[in-house]
């Protein structure tokens, strides 16, 4: 039977779960760590899911029509995902991002035909959001998906990522671990899994040098994609049972470990999530348990960063 797709956005989702057997052995872990490899999405990250869902829902609501311009503030992967879906649907797209994001991310967005507007690095995501709102007022027929406030973001994970994890593990999942950027992933997957497996524990990962969720303090950090510096509207702060802060150095080290031990290149935030998952796996009470950790993207968009500097 033929199995042919007619648009790249039909390829989003159904990403594989990989047990990190070599890392389990190397670190003598007695729990299983299963990594959800979101780099298998067509534009290379978990953000493809929310890009498609936000555009689908905006089209259904009449907010996006032929000739509309999509404007989005993003630290990178959402911009790449939106640029890909916009290209597949024929929309013009403008991405607003802090100048501190990796050069690969900028090049990728441009490769999909997106226009880029860079904002002052020191102002972080707040500066990018303010600039996007300003552009939206100036440009007619524009639409700002607003990943930090758009309920379609967590909904994408309630409808796709959560069910995929549940089905692929036959419901045998004890922990779900994910970094918090917009909070959409941890919220959507967490809500879905807790409905299906009430005993599951959800663990949020944030940068140790910007512990907004655990201590209410924002700061500079190098873990691109998580730690926005504020508590996003779409984040359900009641869904997670624990917050694990991870240092830049540990995120880099564990990100490198995946490539060298498992043969899969992952990004910095995947390294942070793995560090938290390993911390859980080392606890004696978690022997024999299954920990699902979400790896948001691939490492090839971080070749210019300290992740692969040595």
Would you name each region that the model predicts?
Residues 1-310:
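PLP-dependent amino-acid enzyme catalytic core
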């Amino acid at each position: 039977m033929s199995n042919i797709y007619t648009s790249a956005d039909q390829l989003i989702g159904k990403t594989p779960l990989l047990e990190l057997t070599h890392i389990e052995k190397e670190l003598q872990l007695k729990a299983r760590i299963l990594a959800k490899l979101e780099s298998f999405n067509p534009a290379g990250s978990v953000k493809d899911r929310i890009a498609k869902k936000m555009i689908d829902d905006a089209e259904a609501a009449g907010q996006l029509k032929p000739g509309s311009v999509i404007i989005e503030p993003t630290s990178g992967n959402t911009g790449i995902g939106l640029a890909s879906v916009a290209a597949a649907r024929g929309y013009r797209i403008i991405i607003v991002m802090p100048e501190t994001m990796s050069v690969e991310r900028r090049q990728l967005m441009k490769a999909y035909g997106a226009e880029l507007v860079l904002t002052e690095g020191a102002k972080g995501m707040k500066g990018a959001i303010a600039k996007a709102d300003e552009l939206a007022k100036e440009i007619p027929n524009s639409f700002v998906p607003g990943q930090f406030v758009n309920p379609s973001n967590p909904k994408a994970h309630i409808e796709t990522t959560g069910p995929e994890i549940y089905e692929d593990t036959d419901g045998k999942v004890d922990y779900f671990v994910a970094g918090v950027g917009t909070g959409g992933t941890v919220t959507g997957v967490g809500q879905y899994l807790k409905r299906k497996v009430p005993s599951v524990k959800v663990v949020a990962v944030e940068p140790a040098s910007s512990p907004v969720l655990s201590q209410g303090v924002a700061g500079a950090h190098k873990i691109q994609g998580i730690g926005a510096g504020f508590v996003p509207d779409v984040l359900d702060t009641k869904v997670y049972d624990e917050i694990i802060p991870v240092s830049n150095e540990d995120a880099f080290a564990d990100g490198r470990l995946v490539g060298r031990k498992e043969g899969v290149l992952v990004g910095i935030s995947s390294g942070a999530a793995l560090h938290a998952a390993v911390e859980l796996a080392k606890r004696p009470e978690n022997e024999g348990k299954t920990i699902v950790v979400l790896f948001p993207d691939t490492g090839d968009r971080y070749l210019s960063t300290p992740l692969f500097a040595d």
